[in-house]
UniProtKB/Swiss-Prot annotation:
Pfam families: Rotamase, SurA_N
GO terms, molecular function: peptide binding; peptidyl-prolyl cis-trans isomerase activity; unfolded protein binding
GO BP terms: Gram-negative-bacterium-type cell outer membrane assembly; protein folding; protein stabilization
Highest taxon listed in the record's lineage: Bacteria
Entry remark concerning the domains of this protein: The PPIase activity resides only in the second parvulin domain. The N-terminal region and the C-terminal tail are necessary and sufficient for the chaperone activity of SurA. The PPIase activity is dispensable for SurA to function as a chaperone. The N-terminal region and the C-terminal tail are also required for porin recognition.
Signal peptide segment: 1-20
Assigned keywords, A-Z: Chaperone, Isomerase, Periplasm, Repeat, Rotamase, Signal
Protein name: Chaperone SurA
One CC-aspect GO term: outer membrane-bounded periplasmic space
PANTHER family reported in the protein's UniProt record: CHAPERONE SURA
Organism: Pseudoalteromonas atlantica (strain T6c / ATCC BAA-1087)
Function in brief: Chaperone involved in the correct folding and assembly of outer membrane proteins. Recognizes specific patterns of aromatic residues and the orientation of their side chains, which are found more frequently in integral outer membrane proteins. May act in both early periplasmic and late outer membrane-associated steps of protein maturation.
InterPro entries in alphabetical order: OMP_Chaperone_SurA, PPIase_dom_sf, PPIase_PpiC, PPIase_PpiC_CS, PPIase_SurA, SurA_N, Trigger_fact/SurA_dom_sf
Length: 431
């Protein structure tokens, strides 16, 4: 009996200690409004950054600095996740699977190969999968909250179109490194002076050969600090205006700054740059006659009707435009003799598109069934069109939207962070 009691007590002691260790591992490190950041989350993010740095042969600042940056990232993530819950934003498994499939395809691989690559790096596919889900959720939250803050005037579009025209369609893209030495929303002269001095010291270190990514991770207040300040590739027209003006006439590896903005002082590095070629699109001019089957007109009779029209046209006994005006069920083109004008064939449904692309100029197709009904089509002409010129207004709008979205996202995240209740429970995070 004593042996049983001792054994039970020993097992209870082991279980308690094991549980205690788990609790210590998952201690609440930060209270963020109605949520928390766990110690395990901080360690996981720090380890991920270290693993990525090792893979990319990148040096990192001290663990203390890295921990501080990780905590800031997780605070912002927690606030966004809480907002997502309030908004009822969810990503279904099919949506998630499709996204991961797209990621693999864009990388020229398969989901199975992606699994293997993750495993070789010691990353569980399920962990990766849930991380992608979280990124999709935060992306939805940002779009929902930031989009309403963006307004683009016709004059802005017109001005950018003029700029694009002046550049002759040869748009430059820059791969930028970014360090932000921030100051408060309403800085004193002392705040500004202190931030400027720090930015100048950072620039001096970089000019003396210090690694940009390491300095960015240690010192930057920007949203990409944990990525070594890497902003990726940016079109000159989609980057913040201050940056777009500053990078003009620069060369690879140039350092720029400090540049003052409302957020602080920026230091940029031109990691690389490249030009963008004009996009040319093959357009087709065509016309068609559409016959829609109905209760009165069977599918078979509709096809036979177009077959007869084709025979008459090939024999020169009928006029295509007149047949279209009299019989076509497409009201948009019937009044124009079936003329669809110039268009990128990809705007048409697959059956129509594929048939049209297979025709020679002047050739009349066999009757073709699509989701709209039966078509008889004729290819009238072909041309290669400069898509950049044709779509320049849409492009200008998208570039302006991207620029403003990036700027407003930073502002929105800062406002959300500044207004949140945040309590660091571990004193070493406050010191």
């Amino acid at each position: 009996m004593k042996l049983t009691v001792v054994t039970f007590a020993l097992l209870a002691f082991i279980s308690f200690n094991t549980f205690a260790k788990q609790v210590r591992l998952d201690n609440v490190a930060v209270i963020v409004d109605q949520g928390v950041v766990l110690e395990s989350q901080i360690e996981e993010l720090v380890n991920t950054v270290k693993r990525n740095a090792l893979t990319n042969n990148q040096t990192l600042p001290s663990d203390r600095v890295l921990r501080t940056q990780a905590i800031e990232r997780l605070i912002v993530d927690s606030l966004q996740n809480q907002m997502a819950e309030r908004m009822g934003i969810q990503i279904s498994d099919p949506q998630l699977d499709q996204t991961i499939d797209n990621i693999a395809r864009e990388d020229g691989t398969t989901v199975e190969d992606l699994r293997k690559n993750l495993a070789s790096e010691g990353v569980s596919f399920e962990v990766y999968r849930e991380q992608v889900r979280k990124e999709l959720v935060t992306g939805e939250v940002r779009r929902a909250n930031v989009r309403r803050r963006i307004y683009i005037t016709p004059q802005e579009i017109s001005n950018l179109v003029t700029l694009i025209d002046e550049q002759g369609g040869q748009q430059a893209e820059y791969h930028l490194g970014h360090i932000l030495i921030g100051f408060p929303p309403e800085p004193t002269d002392e705040d500004v002076s202190k931030a400027k001095d720090t930015a100048e010291k950072v620039l001096e270190l970089l000019n003396n050969g210090s690694e940009f990514a390491k300095i960015a991770t240690a010192s930057s207040s920007g949203s990409k600090a944990l990525e070594g300040g890497d902003l990726g590739w940016m079109n000159i027209n989609s980057m913040p205006t201050l940056f777009a003006e500053a990078v003009q006439g620069t060369s690879k590896d140039d350092l720029i700054g400090p540049i003052r903005s409302g957020a602080g002082f920026h230091v940029l590095k031109i990691i690389d740059f490249r030009g963008i070629e004009k996009v040319e699109v093959a357009e087709l001019k065509s016309r068609h006659i559409l016959i829609k089957p109905s209760v009165i007109l069977s599918d078979e009779k509709a096809e036979k009707m177009l077959t007869e029209f084709r025979k008459e046209l090939l024999a020169g006994e009928a006029d295509f435009a007149e047949l279209a005006k009299e019989h076509s069920a497409d009201p948009g083109s019937a009044l124009r003799g079936g003329d669809l004008g110039w268009a990128d064939p990809n705007v048409y449904v697959p059956a129509f598109r594929d048939t049209l692309q297979s025709l020679e100029v002047g050739e009349i197709s066999q009757p073709v069934r699509s989701t709209h009904g039966w078509h008889l089509m004729q290819l009238m002409d072909k041309r290669v069109q400069d898509a950049t010129e044709k779509r320049k207004e849409d492009k200008a709008y998208q570039l302006l939207f991207q620029r403003k979205f990036a700027e407003e996202t930073e502002a929105w995240l800062k406002e959300m962070r500044d207004s949140a209740y945040v309590e660091l429970l571990d004193e070493k995070d406050n010191s």
